[in-house]
């Protein structure tokens, strides 16, 4: 019974008038909100995107934390980006770090511990009226590393599958080659044995199988028959003729000494003497026979 009364009292509390109800406090935005974006086209059509109104537009997004010091300044009717007041406060705050009107605005969420001591936390940017949360460096690095590892592992997997396919193809090719060779050799030897069974002589095969006695005997050295190439002979003759033409003519023979008669002249005179019937004494060669007076005595 007590529980029913408590539930009834609770129902009366939440089902009362809207003016009597207390709105629940807004939850602070989460740390990772990179998967969402915010855009209010009605506000963009009503107000310009500049330094004076851009913070009011950012305060409409779910990225805005109502517990920040900028909200306290707004309630005091002070510009929420006034650095002279923000530097005197401690806690969470938003700072406009970069602005390129009207396309790009960059806000930084930071924690202030003193006038000159701040700790950056998150970064947001407004691009052409759409608000986004910038990813943290560690998240970007982890995503890039995971993507790289995935691509490398996929490349190795594809390469391994292709190598396996190539290996299987090579095995099939080798088996086919071995089978074809075995079939061809078998048919070849079968044909040879059939011819030999019929009494026909197979050139080289009968000697390889049956003529084993002659293998131990020394082979007789047969003179190699030299073949004469007529074209080669003509080419050598042409070369020798051209060389002979290029050489200078031989010098004339030296003159004979006085009283010397060559053997050719003596032969001619003897022939003439025999023909005339007169025998003449042979002339003495002065170089060969010089007489007893000019010979050396030993």
Swiss-Prot record:
The keyword Transcription regulation applies. Component of the Mediator complex. Interacts with MED2. Its main location: nucleus. GO terms for cellular component: mediator complex. Component of the Mediator complex, a coactivator involved in the regulated transcription of nearly all RNA polymerase II-dependent genes. Mediator functions as a bridge to convey information from gene-specific regulatory proteins to the basal RNA polymerase II transcription machinery. The Mediator complex, having a compact conformation in its free form, is recruited to promoters by direct interactions with regulatory proteins and serves for the assembly of a functional preinitiation complex with RNA polymerase II and the general transcription factors. One of its GO terms (molecular function) is transcription coregulator activity. The gene is MED6. Keywords: Nucleus, Transcription, Transcription regulation. It comes from Arabidopsis thaliana. It is found in: Nucleus. This is Mediator of RNA polymerase II transcription subunit 6. GO terms for biological process: regulation of transcription by RNA polymerase II. Belongs to the Mediator complex subunit 6 family. The keyword Transport does not apply. Residues 245-298 are annotated as: Disordered. InterPro entries: Mediator_Med6, Mediator_Med6_sf.
């Amino acid at each position: 019974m007590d529980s029913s009364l408590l539930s009834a009292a609770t129902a009366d509390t939440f089902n009362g008038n809207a003016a009597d109800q207390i709105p629940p406090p807004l939850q602070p935005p989460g740390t990772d909100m990179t998967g969402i974006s915010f855009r209010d086209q009605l506000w963009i059509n009503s107000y310009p995107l500049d330094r004076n109104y851009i913070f009011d537009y950012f305060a409409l997004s779910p990225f805005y934390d109502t517990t920040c010091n900028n909200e306290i300044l707004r309630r005091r009717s002070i510009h929420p980006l006034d650095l002279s007041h923000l530097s005197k406060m401690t806690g969470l705050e938003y700072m406009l770090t970069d602005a390129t009107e009207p396309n790009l605005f960059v806000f930084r969420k930071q924690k202030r511990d003193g006038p000159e001591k701040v700790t950056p936390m998150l970064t947001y940017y407004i691009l052409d009226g759409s608000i986004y949360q910038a990813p943290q460096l560690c998240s970007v690095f982890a995503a890039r590393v995971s993507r790289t590892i995935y691509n490398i592992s996929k490349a190795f997997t594809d390469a391994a599958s292709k190598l396996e396919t190539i290996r299987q193809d090579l095995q099939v090719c080798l088996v086919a080659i071995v089978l074809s060779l075995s079939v061809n050799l078998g048919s070849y030897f079968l044909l040879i044995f059939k011819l030999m069974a019929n009494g026909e002589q197979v050139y080289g095969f009968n000697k390889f199988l049956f003529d084993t006695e002659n293998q131990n005997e020394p082979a007789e050295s047969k003179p190699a028959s030299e073949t004469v190439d007529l074209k080669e002979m003509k080419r050598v003759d042409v070369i020798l003729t051209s060389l002979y033409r290029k050489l200078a003519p031989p010098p004339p023979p030296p003159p004979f000494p006085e009283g010397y008669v060559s053997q050719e002249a003596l032969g001619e005179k003897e022939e003439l003497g025999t023909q005339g019937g007169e025998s003449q004494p042979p002339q003495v060669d002065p170089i060969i026979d010089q007489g007893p007076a000019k010979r050396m005595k030993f």
